[in-house]
Design a protein with these regions (language model features):
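A generic structural signal for tightly packed, nonpolar segments enriched in small/aliphatic residues
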Residues: 1-147
Length: 147
């Protein structure tokens, strides 16, 4: 309803991010322009993020015979974090009304791996919870506030 300039979500939806990129790199999925912006700002504040694709063919995994959308498909394990991102994208919305309305720019940061450091301290992170993405979100907020 508010039609924001962009939507950025930070979540731990599946363990797939940890499997794919380990505990130090956050996969970022969404609209290419916003994903690039998030990753660039993350690098500037010392957080490691990596763009991941959203292959269109994975969206069909969420098709359901009894609901508008399913959040998972029993037995389907390939591309778990990508399927989860497709699920989130389904709720993003558009900037206007009608079929030609532009989508709201959106990025999903899957912090399942990087939210907790089980290894040796690195950078500004000790062992344990890392607070990953906080500095990036602050940098993004500052970036959006500039004219």
């Amino acid at each position: 309803e508010e039609k924001p300039d962009a939507i950025v979500d930070v979540a731990t939806l599946t363990g797939s991010a940890r499997v794919a990129l380990g505990e130090r790199i956050v996969p970022v999925m969404g609209d290419d322009g916003l994903v690039r912006r998030v990753i660039e700002l993350a690098g500037g504040v010392g957080e490691s993020m990596w763009a991941m694709p959203l292959p269109p063919e994975l969206r069909s995994v969420l098709d359901s015979e009894v609901a508008d959308i399913a959040n998972a498909k029993p037995g389907h394990t390939a591309g778990g974090m990508l399927v989860a991102a497709h699920f989130l994208r389904a709720f993003v919305g558009t900037r206007g009304e009608g079929t030609d309305a532009a989508p709201i720019p959106w990025a999903h940061l899957d912090i399942a791996g990087a939210a907790n450091n089980s290894g040796a301290p690195f950078g500004t992170n000790g062992k344990g919870p890392t607070g990953i993405a906080v500095r990036t979100l602050l940098a993004l907020t500052e970036d959006f506030s500039r004219p």
